[in-house]
Amino acid sequence: MTYRLPLIYKKLLILCVVFGPILWLMFTEDGQRRTDTLVLWLFGEEEISMDLAALSNQYTEQELDKVYAQLKWHCQDHVDAYGERHCVARIGIFNGIPARYLTVFYRDGRLTAVKLQYRAHNHDQLQSQLLTLLGEPKQPVQTNTEDPDQVLQWRTHFGLVLMKQALHGNDEPALLWLSSGLVSGTLATASKNATK
C-alpha cells in the first residue's frame, strides 16, 4: 500500500514553498533588510564591516585607507570639533545594515571620530545590533533643547558610541564613535566654559 498526499495538500505545500519566502522578504523587517542589502550589492554599492568596540585613536589615515581600500574617499582639511581633517566615502552596507555615508575624522593623522549615516528605516535594526554587540547602553544623555531627545551611549575600550534613541521628523539618521581623547577634551572644554 502506497501512501499518497491528497492533491489539495500538494498544492498548499507548493504555494507555501513559493510564496512563503516572498512574503517573508516583503513583510518582515529582517526580510526587507536582506532585500535592501542584496539590491545595494547588485547595484555595486560597497559593503564594509567595522568593529566599533575595537576602534581607537591609534589608527592612522593610511591604515584605514589600506583596510578600506575599496572605498573612494573624498578628503578635506577642515578644522572642527572632531579634528582637522575628514574623509567621506559613500557606502551601501555597514555591518549588514543598509547605509549611505561613512565619515572619518583625524587630528594629527590619528582617528578621532567616525560618523555613519544610515537609512532611517533601519534605525531599530542598527540599534538592536548595537545592543547585541556592545550590550546595554549607559543612562541616556539629555540634550539641551526644549524637547530633549534621548541619546544612547555605549562605552568602548577606546571611545564612546552615540546614537539617538528615536528619530523624529527631519532628524539625521547617524551614529557617532568618538575617541576617548576627543570625549575627555570635549568634557574639559565644556567644564571650563561652564565655570566662566
Residue ranges and their predicted role:
Residues 2-139, 178-196:
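Short helix/turn-capping signatures at newly exposed starts of structured segments
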